[in-house]
Amino acid sequence: LPDSEGKIHLMFLDDVIRYCLPMIFVGMKYTDYEAYTFKFTKDAEMEMDSDLRTGVLQKISKGVKSRKKGEPIRFVYDESMPKDLLKKLTHLLNVDKSDTRVAGGRYHNFKDLMKFPDCGRKDLKYPVWPPLFKSELNGMESLITLIRQKDRSLHYPYHSFDTFIRVLREAAISKEVKSIKMTLYRLAKDSKVVKALIAAARNGKKVTVIIELLARFDEASNINWSKKLQDAGVHVIFGVEGLKIHSKLLHVSTRYGDFACISTGNFHEGNARMYTDYTIMTAHRPIVREVNYVFEFIEKPYTPIVFKELLVSPNDMRKKFITLINKEIKNKEQGKEAYILCKVNHITDKVLIEKLYAASAAGVKVDLVVRGNCSLVTGISGISENIQINGIIDRYLEHSRIFIFANNGEERYYIGSADWMPRNLDNRIEVITPVYDKEIQKDLKRIVEYGLRDTAKGRIVDGSGENRPWQTKEHTLFRSQEELYKSYKI
């Protein structure tokens, strides 16, 4: 709302309606006008049809529709609302006393601020950080050929997701490509990924897509995309009964050798502009072979497969992480170099937390970057005094999972889709891959170390629940996301 002095004033739509009530009810001869907001939340769990004659797609479609009839679980209302109006509303909405009623303020939908209007004030905005193109991957040479030469990596959103789209498009038209297999969890509204897969199928490639229909709140979108893929001749598989497919995988078979992509995040153009995720593209034969094994496991569930390179859940991921941590404990006890560096979204798995406590008690330095839920408590004498945790909330949502183990000077690096949570380790198909390329290892270590050094947007996660900011002078503040962007820009 501009004024005569050239200033711009902002107003909630709620207030526009509130102040314009006389115009809305013109001719009704009311003398007083009052308006109160409320927010009504229903249970989002889906009712799944158990009829064996019903296909998976039909079950999920029916389940999505059942959400409209979900039980009320939360009712937030303007605390100034008159009691008689509140009583009438709760009766009409069938919100009984057992439901959660929360007296709140006048505004309940602050997520709308994610679409904050452009007021022409550049000083109120983040500086523009255009996604970068890696010079090694930005020429005219075949990206598939470049991946065969050595492992390649992309770190979104610092690097452009368009490079990955180029890989898919090249695979779709290349005469040497025989088949493409891919897992899809969440997809953009106008997905270039799906369009490339459809183009590949129309060009005679054998395309198999594993699409997770139970990606929470994206079920309807995934159902729509799966139908389009099927119409184009793509072989679509709807996951494994009882296991959510959360791994981010691409396997491409060619006449001159296969390659694979393993990522920490979704193949989603929108997410790649807001989430920090890491993708490895490799022709390393043992890894590529085992990525194909994962697809075989999904197509033929519960087939016994032994993975030597990959860490795969629910197969053996927790067990292998325990082995890696135990190795650090043993090395420390023998006077060898030992430490653990990790960057994850969440740590809530009791078994792994207790193992990290054991490592700390043995003298192993454990440094973690954890954005979300963290059940690990630092600073307990004799238990966790060797554990440090930094949590970063900045312009990009920290989403990559990186694991580094000292291994007596011969560091072992891993990235993948899993957090250290029971659901990731027990109830999902997740994949973590080792990383052998020295340049990529150096990049991964820089990412974690920058995260640990972040005093501008980082918070000390110590188990108190306060997530205290670092006590650092303004001129010495270190902001990891900004410094990473600068390092990639050089």
Specify the residue positions occupied by each region the protein language model found.
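Hydrophobic alpha/beta core scaffold segments
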Residues: 365-369
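N-terminal localization/anchoring segments of enzymes in phospholipid and broader phosphate metabolism
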Residues: 1-340, 358-362, 374-396, 402-490
